């Protein structure tokens, strides 16, 4: 799962971003369904989805799309999910933030 998170350990100045793939993994939802939920949320907020879009290479070296969300957008997305799913994702977000806060050696 560490390969899915987008952080800079040691306080590199970048905010923690959670990928739509990691949200899907943590919630047990299909990645296409999470992407659909994100696109709907961003549309409802009148925000440009392309700002959050990211291309990655899958295991077969094919380009695939995902979204990288900051904490506010991640929490907003989770409002539509069950409390159990919200807890899992927010716990992971706290782990990522703790990694970011660790001093770099």
Residue ranges and their predicted role:
Residues 1-105:
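An anion-engaging/catalytic patch
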